[in-house]
Amino acid sequence: MAIFRDQAENHVEHDRSIEDRRRHRQLVEKSIKENLGDILSEESIIGETKNKKYKIPIRGIKEYQFIYGANNKGVTTGTGEERRGDRISSDKRKAISNNKAGNQEGKDIYETEITLEELMDYIVEDLDLPNLDRKKYSEIIVESAAKKRGYQKYGVRPRLAKKKTVMCKIARKQGKKRALREIGEEAEIGRFPFREDDLRYYKVKKHPKKESNAVMIFIMDVSGSMDNTKKYLARSFFFVLSRFIRRKYNNVAFEFISHTTTAKNVNEYEFFHKGESGGTYISSGINAAIDLIKEKYNPGVWNIYPFYASDGDNWSEDNEKAMEAVNEISDLSNMFGYIELLPSTYSTTMFYRFKKEISKKNFVSVTVKEKKDLWNAIKYMLSEELQEKNKE
């Protein structure tokens, strides 16, 4: 005897497409995270608006099905390292690789689009700004978001409290019924429209709150040894970093410094677009940041995070001054980050000297040897684990 069950009342639990949709979302998120490095290495990302779209390849999901084997003898087993979706086979057919021909079935690939704003959402998931220390007198007074504090009879339409308005209308209607019953009349009331007196609006009040001061100081070497590729890598690093921080925090100040043998404060547009040439004194850029800190950002009041990008090619007479400057700015800062771009010879760049001679716990240095290293450098600089280690 056949038994039929009606699943109409709880059809969601028996919707077979739910699992497919969940797996599809996982694949999309996985592909986006795996391609973050490629997106961030695009030169077009610098200065783009939040609605700029980027294409990301995603492997398609196929329905499970039985297929014919190759009539090979023996039994195929796994190695224990397989993941969901891997094909276990002893087939010797070769896949297409290195742009050469093969004889194995390909994978379905399609593209999805993601905006720069959505890209920042995924970056926020993986990265975290160094914790802002609560310093004495370090708070600034900012206006918090408005909070609802009761009701009032006047206000703007967006703040109309609909539920409270309906309750006032019902109370007025019930009051009228009681009045009619008291004078002996029929209490049945027909159409009962809203009146101006029924309207209630949310009363909002903005409360000041304290937030920690934080300033990010971006310093970039724009000398002749910094070719277009190096400058692009530096600007990409700073651009993504600034977008991420602005998205995560509302009250962070930014300062921009570019230098050759001399340094100068520039605005954000000049920092990301203007190029120069000349010799290199690393100390000039760092000393300019030190002067700026002493002038505007008291370390007892501000949380200070300078980041410096260079190819590490410094004029030899300036090396000792550069070492002194790095030590001094590290003492003034919560963290000082040094990014060295496309170093030609490891042992001759400032990265080697800094690693060997700078013992400050809050000094963090990375190298970017090619475009694909950019994303790892950003993660390394801002990883929460790294910051916790630096505090110890």
UniProtKB/Swiss-Prot annotation:
HAMAP family per UniProt: UPF0229
Residue ranges of the region described as Disordered: 75-100
Family statement: Belongs to the UPF0229 family.
Domain of life assignment: Bacteria
Biased composition (Basic and acidic residues): 80-94
Protein name according to UniProt: UPF0229 protein CPF_1540
UniProt-listed Gene3D superfamilies: von Willebrand factor, type A domain
Pfam families assigned to the protein according to its UniProt record, in alphabetical order: DUF444
